[in-house]
């Protein structure tokens, strides 16, 4: 063979002359990376029996460089302590590159099958091997791919090695976290037991005192937190009653604002029965879609009026509380009545009878309703 190499010709060679070794191959560290994805061989098949002699991948090198070899990679997996063989994988390298860069074309080597295109030069190519940061190429061939060959997609050796290392690091981190959490739990348990024993003895540690002070401070801050609704710069009809006198926002009780007794008006949302009263009020959507609406101009504004009618159960306790608030501004308050009763006790029985407010002065609002329901008509012009 000349130093410049000769062109490959398969014309006079028998297809049975395919040199190989009976060895299962050898482990080689830092194997150069192939330009191409590997081929996974069907279990039980023989690569050298199925591989065409011109089975060179397309896409790299010129006509003279279409020569090289397929290198075997044996694989296995440990299952319950037993080694389980996996299908072989074969990687392609150009002549003069890869793990057998010093080998000559057709040398008999362990796990090596030589291939070349007709007319290729049987001398080392200068194509080198793939860099670790470059992605492997998909396998493409001129001829038909044997059925025993499975062409892998982006399963290069470095990716496989990277995934294996990543899984190993992940397992190590997981085990480390597990041990750390276990140790932390043990430490916490011991600490809690010691603190509990000290507490029984009436001894408080600095940490417990700090926690107690911190909780007290939090409770103090929560008590002073301002929950007053922000009603400034809002229209009257957009304001929200807070704790305290509602006349600041809605004015004194009158024929156009006739809901609420003196206690409710003075205390707003903090009044005793406010939550129950609020439950008897229609929802926004009910008012919006279930009311009769009218509008008219009022200077530089538009006055909107709506009439809404709905029913409350007559015998429900909340209904009675609600009805007592209608036009309550025109009736004596409970506070005023109680004050009068106290004054009357210091006076004569005759004077007391004259000053006690007769029950007939308290309007009865239930006589206008039927036996089962309360019908209400609200008219809002604000």
From Swiss-Prot:
One of its GO terms (cellular component) is ribonucleoprotein complex. Pfam families: CoV_nucleocap. It is found in: Virion; Host endoplasmic reticulum-Golgi intermediate compartment; Host Golgi apparatus. Residues 231-334 are annotated as: Dimerization. One of its GO terms (molecular function) is RNA binding. Keywords: ADP-ribosylation, Host Golgi apparatus, Phosphoprotein, Ribonucleoprotein, RNA-binding, Transcription, Transcription regulation, Viral nucleoprotein, Virion. The modification Phosphoserine is found at residues 9, 156, 254, 256. Residues 224-337 form the CoV N CTD domain. Residues 154-163 have a biased composition (Low complexity). Packages the positive strand viral genome RNA into a helical ribonucleocapsid (RNP) and plays a fundamental role during virion assembly through its interactions with the viral genome and membrane protein M. Plays an important role in enhancing the efficiency of subgenomic viral RNA transcription as well as viral replication. Belongs to the alphacoronavirus nucleocapsid protein family. Homooligomer. Both monomeric and oligomeric forms interact with RNA. Interacts with protein M. Interacts with NSP3; this interaction serves to tether the genome to the newly translated replicase-transcriptase complex at a very early stage of infection. This is Nucleoprotein. It comes from Porcine respiratory coronavirus (strain RM4).
């Amino acid at each position: 063979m000349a130093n410049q190499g000769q062109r490959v010709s398969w014309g006079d060679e028998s297809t049975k002359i395919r040199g190989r070794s009976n060895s299962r191959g050898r482990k080689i560290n830092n194997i150069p990376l192939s330009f191409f994805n590997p081929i996974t061989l069907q279990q039980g098949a023989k690569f050298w029996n199925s591989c065409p002699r011109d089975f060179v991948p397309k896409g790299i090198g010129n006509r003279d460089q279409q020569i090289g070899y397929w290198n075997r990679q044996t694989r296995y997996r440990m299952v319950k302590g037993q080694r389980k063989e996996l299908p072989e994988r074969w990687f392609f390298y150009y002549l003069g590159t890869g793990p057998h860069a010093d080998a000559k074309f057709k040398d008999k080597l362990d796990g090596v099958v030589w291939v070349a295109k007709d007319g290729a030069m049987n001398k080392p190519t200068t194509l080198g091997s793939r860099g670790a940061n470059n992605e492997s190429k998909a396998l493409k061939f001129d001829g038909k791919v044997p059925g025993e060959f499975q062409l892998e997609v982006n399963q290069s050796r470095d990716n496989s090695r990277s995934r294996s290392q990543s899984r190993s690091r992940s397992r190590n981190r997981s085990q480390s976290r597990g041990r750390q959490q276990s140790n932390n739990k043990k430490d916490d348990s011991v600490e809690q037991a010691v603190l509990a024993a000290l507490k029984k003895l009436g001894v408080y540690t600095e940490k417990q005192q700090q926690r107690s002070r911190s909780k007290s401070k939090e409770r103090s801050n929560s008590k002073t937190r301002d929950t007053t609704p922000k009603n400034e710069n809002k229209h009257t009809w957009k304001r929200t009653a807070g704790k305290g006198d509602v006349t600041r926002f809605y004015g004194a009780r009158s024929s156009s604002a006739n809901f609420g007794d003196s206690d409710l008006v003075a205390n707003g949302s903090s009044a005793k029965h406010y939550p129950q009263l609020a439950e008897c009020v229609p929802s926004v959507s009910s008012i919006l879609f279930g009311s009769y609406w009218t509008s008219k101009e009022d200077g530089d504004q538009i006055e909107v009026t709506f009439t809404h009618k709905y029913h409350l159960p007559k015998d429900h306790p909340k209904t009675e509380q609600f009805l007592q608030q209608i036009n309550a501004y025109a009736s004596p308050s409970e506070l005023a009545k109680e004050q009068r009763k106290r004054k009357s006790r210091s006076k004569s029985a005759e004077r007391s009878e004259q000053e006690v407010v007769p029950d007939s002065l308290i309007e009865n609002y239930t006589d206008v309703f039927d036996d089962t329901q309360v019908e209400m008509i609200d008219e809002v012009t604000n």
